Structure formats: C-alpha cells, structure tokens
Amino acid sequence: MSEQSTLAGPYTEKPGVESQNPTGDGKASFDETSPRDIHGWRWAIAYAAMLSTTFLFALDNTIVANIQPSIINDFGHLELISWIGTGFALGTMFILLWGKIYGVFNIKWVYIFNILLFEVGSAVCGAAPNIQALIIGRVIAGIGGSGMYSGTLTYVSVLSNQKEKPAYLAGSTVVWGVGSVVGPVVGGAFAASSATWRWGFYINLPIGAVFAPAYMILFPNWDPNPTLTLAEKFRLVDWINAVIFLAGSACLTVALTFGGVVYSFNSGTIIALWTVTGVLLVAFIVLLKLHPLVSKENRLYPLHFFKQMTLINMQLQVFLASGIILAMTYYVPLYFQFIKGDGALQAGVRLLPLIMFMVAFSMVNGFLMPKYGLIPIWYIVGSALTLIGSALMYTIDENTSNGNVYGYNILVGAGAGCYIVAGFAIVQSLVPTHEIANAVGAMTISQDLGMVLFLAICGSLFHNVAVDKVGKALPSASETEIGNLIAGTSSSAFQALSEADKDLVIPEIASAMKSIWAFFMAAAALSFVCSWPLFKTKLGGKKVEASVVV
C-alpha cells in the first residue's frame, strides 16, 4: 500500500478538494468545494453532537478539581487523591493510538465506540464503592474521552474545506472553554448539594443520551481504507509500540505520583519504576527505527520528526502551556478553599478569570494568526505573560487580596491562550499533507503528556512540602493526620481543628503552594526561552494558512 493511502487516513481529501499542503513548504492552497455529503440542518445537528462530546471531555477534565475533598471524606486514602485527576489524564494517553486508528478504520464506529467507553467510565465513577474503583472509572473515561476528542478533530478535518475549518474549530474552542469553566463550578455545586459528588460523573449519561440519535443517524460513514479487509487494517496499526508507550507512561506517572508520598524516593519500588520507564523508553525508540512488523510510515510516531526542531518546539510549548493551565484549575480553587475559607462551589467560580481569558485569547490567536502571522511574537508575549503571572502567584499568601489573585490568574490565562493551541496550526505547515495526521497526533499526545505529568508532579510537590511545613506547625500530629488535613477544607480532619490551630496551618499551606507556583515559573521560563528560536523558522511566508484546534 502506498504511503499516501496509509498515512493520509482521516486527512485524505475527496476528489476535487485540493490538498492543504502537498509539499510541506508551509504554503497552503484552497478549494472551496465542500468535502462532505451532509448539509443544512442535518450537518448542524451532527456538528452540535460533535461539540457535545468536546464539552463532556472538557467538563471531565476539570470537574474533579473541587470534589476531591468530598471523595476523600467518603473513601479515605489521601495518598491516592492525585489519581482522581491523574487517572483521567493517564487514560488520555491513548490519543496517540486513537489518531492512528482513525486513520485506518471507519471513523463513525470508532467515534461511537469511544463515546460508549466514556459513558461506561462515567457510570463506573458515579457508582464506585471505593476510591480504587473510582480511579479505574476515571482511566476508562479518559481513554474514551481522548478518543472522542480525536474523533472530533478527525471529522472536522475530513468534512470541512480549508475556508470552513477555522470557524468550525473556533466553535470547538468556545465549547471546550465553556466545559472547562463550568467543570469546577458544577463539581462544587454537586459536592455541596444532596446530589453529592457522584452526580459530577453521572451528569455525562443524560447529556450523552440526548445526542445519541445524532451519533447513530447523522454521523457520516467515512472509511479511509474501504478496500482493505479488517485483518489488513489491523496490521496497519503499531500495536506493540502502543503497548510499550502506554506502559511507559503508566510507570512514569506512578513514579512521579507515589514518590515521596506512598514510597520514599530511594525505595526499591520507585527505583524499579524509574528503571522500567527508562527501559521502555529505549525499547520504544528502537522500535520506531527498527520495527520488524510495521512499515515505517505506519509506526506510532514518525522518527524523522525528531529532526524537525520547530515541530519539536511546538510539542514542547503545548506540553508546558497545557500542563500549567490544567494544574492551575486544581490548585487555584484549593488556595481559595484553604486561605479564603471558600466552599467548593465558590472556589470553582474563582477560576473564571483564568479560564475565560485563556479561551478568549485562544480565539483571538485562532482568528488573527492565520491572517497576520507574527508567530514568534505570539509565543514570546504569551510565555512572558505566563511567566509574569506565575511569578506573581509565587508572591501570594494568606493576606493577598482576591483582586490581586484574579489579576495574576488573568495574566497566566491570557498568556497561555496566546499560544496554547497555535502549534496545531503551525505543524500543518511544516509537513506534507500525508503527514498532517501524524503531526496533529504528535501535538495532541504532547498536550496530554503535559497534563498528566504536571498533575503528578504538582501533587507530589504539594503533598511532600505541605506535610513537612504543617508537621512543624503541629508537631504533635502524625503524618497521616497531617495528610488528611491538607486534603481540603471540607475534610473532617481540617474541620476538627481549633481556630488557633487553623491559624497555624493556613499560612503553612499557603507557603507549601509556593512550590507549585515556582514549578509553573520554571515551566513558563523554559517556554519563553524556547520561543526565541522561532524567529529563524521558515514557514513559507508571513501567513500560516491552517486550522487551529484546542
């Protein structure tokens, strides 16, 4: 099979629709012919159904930010609290595999399978009898959610021409932003109500049910390889390296999450996890080069991408920006709960400045960058604002006004919004048409890795530093008691403290959070430094004629 037919996958154009970038020279050509057969109200409903999955995916990314203390109150196991968020993010590591699968199998049925998987995971979370079952449900939902997200990108790519695509993807940006904004608020509202935190997961079921007829009836059948048998299609997927990649991601996440929390950093378990991670990484790279069962064009990640420094830079930038934003959605509400005494619902509302400005500036970038270019400026200004905002967050304590915290959050949100999604457009100008699927897949996996690793690192940082500082403030408390205290203000351990002890604990928790803001500063500084080489990047002219995705 030719490279075009196997790699183009979901990005293969219909006859009469011109290639976006056949040479990879950074210049795009356009044909206003619509590549889809569905129009009018049928297309409007189908597109709305796609946006519903984007909304649910975004909602689930942030909804647990405010309900974790309630979950710990019910189940205990504080040492596993970070896995409520990390488990979902770890499940999204499947997005690299889903991108390949969408390029081989019928898009509609892969998409519907992922919707079902997401709903099953949500049901498992809502009905979970213990925290272990909840984490398993979160992983399942993450796997399905990443498949839905990849499916939306795929459908928009094959069902819209280059003139339409920015508008349709801008709609996805808005819906994703709305889902991210309301996630902590909805989660906090459920946690504070008689419905309990379980409805933070059950809510996905009725929304999915409403759009189910559209999924089944209106989603177009699109098979990128209609002449191949099922067995031939399976042979086009790099299953071995997919398993190695997922196993390595899991080992790395466990090592980062449990190190210093469940096991000491120098314990045999943590050392073994790091060793296995390293071995799997080497095996992954070797198989990218020398895989005996899969052709070069069908391997999980194109090895020659490592030689394209701008593409690697784009992956690093989305890794850093996405990690900062998602981790902020977890720790800004925690700050307001501990330091300002907010309830779960009110703390969730405090995220609005961060998320709204991030979404607004993402949309501004999506509409202006394709017209005016200035790619390095977006990255330099954006990373600088993120760095300044993170540095100012490092200065906050229990006496900082809410207005100041909002202002610092706005800087971080606006800064990240300037470039968090820009790379998705840029990479499509760096590669030939038949490799756009691979380039977008590389960006999405970098985005998800950033979210997974930042949550894991921040969870470990906060737990270790807070236990040490609070332990000094309350020398008579055991490490287990201290761990329960820092789970959140709604935890029974924190509520049981006297007002005098709370006055001792709260400043120490604010101080412990400085480790997280410092980590964000380092990440933003790296992003800023790596933005300057973009001035030397040739993208085929001042304009980037490509779509932007979230």
Curated annotation (Swiss-Prot):
GO terms for cellular component: plasma membrane. The chain crosses the membrane at residues 44-64, 78-98, 109-129, 139-159, 172-192, 199-219, 242-262, 268-288, 319-339, 351-371, 373-393, 410-430, 439-459, 515-535. It is found in: Cell membrane. Glycans are attached at residue 399. Pfam families: MFS_1 (PF07690). PROSITE patterns: MFS. SUPFAM superfamilies: MFS general substrate transporter. GO terms for molecular function: transmembrane transporter activity. Signal peptide: none annotated. Residues 1-33 are annotated as: Disordered. It comes from the Eukaryota. Keywords: Cell membrane, Glycoprotein, Membrane, Transmembrane, Transmembrane helix, Transport. It is a multi-pass membrane protein. InterPro entries: MFS, MFS_dom, MFS_trans_sf. Induction: Expression correlates with the production of depudecin with high levels on oat grain medium, and minimal levels on oat flower medium and complete medium. Belongs to the major facilitator superfamily. TCR/Tet family. Efflux pump; part of the gene cluster that mediates the biosynthesis of depudecin, a highly oxidized eleven-carbon linear polyketide that acts as a histone deacetylase (HDAC) inhibitor and makes a small contribution to pathogenesis. Is presumed either to be responsible for exporting depudecin, to provide self-protection, or both. PANTHER family: MAJOR FACILITATOR SUPERFAMILY, MAJOR FACILITATOR SUPERFAMILY (MFS) PROFILE DOMAIN-CONTAINING PROTEIN-RELATED. This is Efflux pump DEP3. It comes from Fusarium langsethiae.
